[in-house]
Structure formats: structure tokens, C-alpha cells
Amino acid sequence: MIGSGFVRAFAIVVVMLVCIDSSAKGGVDLEAKMREYGLVDIATVDSTIMVDLKYAETDNFVGSNMYGTLRKAFFRPEIARALAAVQRELKRTDKHLSLIIYDAARPQSAQQRMWDKVKDTPNRRYVAKPHRGGHHNFGIAVDVSIVRDGVPIDMGSAFDSFSDVSHIDNESGLLRRKLITREALNNRQLLRRLMRAQGFTTYRREWWHFQQYDINYARRHFRLLDF
């Protein structure tokens, strides 16, 4: 027979786990909110695209899980379709290659936590201010790279590396200074070529970031993920 002390201890552990999970996602069912706001799970459009949401882990620049149990990448439907088209073309290039998504639609609450982390540091230039929302906060941006047989290919720097090596506006200089390899440059160019062909634009400080729509247009016409 299980003693009452064991039962009490087990109950405490369960309550702690529930609190941790609730704290991580602010008590909000993020997947349900994404759907409520009209976004779609990329896996329902193309299940071959890999997803590894870095802000659903603790190994990120904030140092905490900001997405709780959310593991799916959500976008506006037209963005998801464009990514599926990129994936098809990438597979035509080499069947062993695949897109991998590191971040997708991002709640405004997560944007606030990111901003709070960097606002008093030089790294604030890498993070959009949360009060009006950036492209991620409207479901129209993606942080993405390429894997070969499930292994990330060389892009010259890690995702979310806050350094000039992540910038794309002077890659010839990075190559000349041997800060990136020719292979890494070729890989970046492949990703950019495929993404641009589907209407995505780049952000000069992050090789992994792509977006669609002017941000002012998005603020007028799309719903901010204000949760």
C-alpha cells in the first residue's frame, strides 16, 4: 500500500511540473492561439520541412523556453505555401537537402522578453522592438537554414550568432578575411536564391532571416500576435 507521504510528494511534483509548463508559455495555449489568428502549421502544407524551434528550448540567447510545449511552426497561409515551393525546388537541386525552420510566427510576449534581454546592450540592433511588432509577430517571417540528411550544412555562423559573421552585406569581405569559407558562402547564396525566387526578402544582419511584405503594410492589414 502506498503511504500518504508518498502520495503528497507525488502530488507536489505534479503541481510543480504543471506550474513550470504554465510559466513557460504564460498560461496560453500557443498552438490554439496561432490557429485562432488564422495561421497554419507548416507540416500541414509540407511535412518534409524540418522544424526545430530554438525558442522552445533553453539553448538560445535569452536562455529560456519562451514557447512552452509549442513545437510546430506557424505562418500565414501564403507564407507556408511559399516555403513549400522553396522546399520542392531545394529537393530538385539535391534530394538529400531540406529546409529546417528555427523560428516562425512569434507571439508579442516572446518578442518583449527578447527585447528586455538586449535593450541595454549593443545587441538590441538585432531584435525588433515589441510594441508595434516585427515581421515574426505577424506570421510573415521565418528563420531558416538547410540540412543534408538531417545535419545542418555550413553557413559560416550559428543561428542567432550576434556578430558581423552573420551579416550578408559584406560576405566577400568575410571570405577575404577567412571568417567564412567558400562553401559557407555558396550555401548562403543557395538559400537566398531559392527564397528570393518565392518572394522573400532578406535582413542584412542575419543570413537565416527571411520575410515577406513591408512591415507598415503588415501593420495595417494583418493581425498582430498580441498574446
Q: What is the role of each PLM region?
A:
Residues P107:
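Segments that shape or occlude catalytic/ligand-binding pockets
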Residues F210:
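Conserved metal-phosphate-binding beta-hairpin within the catalytic cores
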Residues A110:
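Short, well-ordered surface patches within globular domains
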